[in-house]
């Protein structure tokens, strides 16, 4: 049996990407953003097609993502942040709630969101991961933007066939 398959597409030319970056743990978040923007450029996304907004912390990321999603101007969004474990339960709360909020926005607005909000035990782990995770976020955003656009086209083929059948019936 032969099955259809979609090959990953990392061509960023023409894609519009919105990035929301937390300022808490700023050196790590700046490292994430630098790596992400550099990778977007390498993938062909034009600088004028990228909007970067910053928010105070990880819990504010979902609301900013929601506003960007509501605008309808972006093919994909990226969440950048760093939640580093401290001595209280706050780490779990921030990690869980920001992650759930990001997922909800993606599903509610049918827009891909690359989640690169790091959750680490200490600063060293965050610094060690920031560059590669920033790059990963760019690749995920571009690939998922292209995938969702390709999947959106699946329904268009059926509509085109129905229109062709309707046109033939009208001519008969």
Curated annotation (Swiss-Prot):
Belongs to the DMRL synthase family. It comes from the Bacteria. 5-amino-6-(D-ribitylamino)uracil binds at residues 24, 58-60, 82-84, 115. GO terms for cellular component: cytosol; riboflavin synthase complex. Pathway: Cofactor biosynthesis; riboflavin biosynthesis; riboflavin from 2-hydroxy-3-oxobutyl phosphate and 5-amino-6-(D-ribitylamino)uracil: step 1/2. Residues 154-172 have a biased composition (Acidic residues). It comes from Burkholderia multivorans (strain ATCC 17616 / 249). It is an enzyme of class 2 (transferase). This is 6,7-dimethyl-8-ribityllumazine synthase. Keywords: Riboflavin biosynthesis, Transferase. The keyword Membrane does not apply. Residues 150-172 are annotated as: Disordered. Catalyzes the formation of 6,7-dimethyl-8-ribityllumazine by condensation of 5-amino-6-(D-ribitylamino)uracil with 3,4-dihydroxy-2-butanone 4-phosphate. This is the penultimate step in the biosynthesis of riboflavin.
């Amino acid at each position: 049996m032969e099955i259809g398959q979609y090959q990953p597409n990392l061509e960023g030319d023409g894609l519009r990407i919105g990035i929301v970056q937390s300022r808490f743990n700023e050196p790590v978040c700046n490292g994430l953003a630098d790596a992400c923007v550099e990778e977007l450029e390498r993938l062909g996304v034009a600088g004028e097609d990228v909007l970067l907004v910053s928010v105070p912390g990880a819990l504010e990321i979902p609301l900013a993502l929601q506003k960007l999603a509501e605008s309808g101007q972006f093919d994909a969004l990226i969440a950048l942040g760093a939640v580093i474990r401290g001595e209280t339960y706050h780490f779990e709360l921030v990690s869980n709630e920001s992650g759930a909020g990001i997922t909800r926005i993606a599903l509610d607005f049918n827009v891909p969101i690359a989640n690169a909000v790091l959750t680490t035990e200490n600063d060293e782990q965050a610094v060690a991961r920031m560059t590669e995770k920033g790059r990963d976020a760019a690749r995920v955003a571009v690939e998922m933007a292209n995938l969702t656009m390709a999947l959106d086209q699946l329904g268009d083929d059926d509509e085109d066939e129905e229109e062709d059948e309707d046109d033939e019936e009208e001519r008969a």
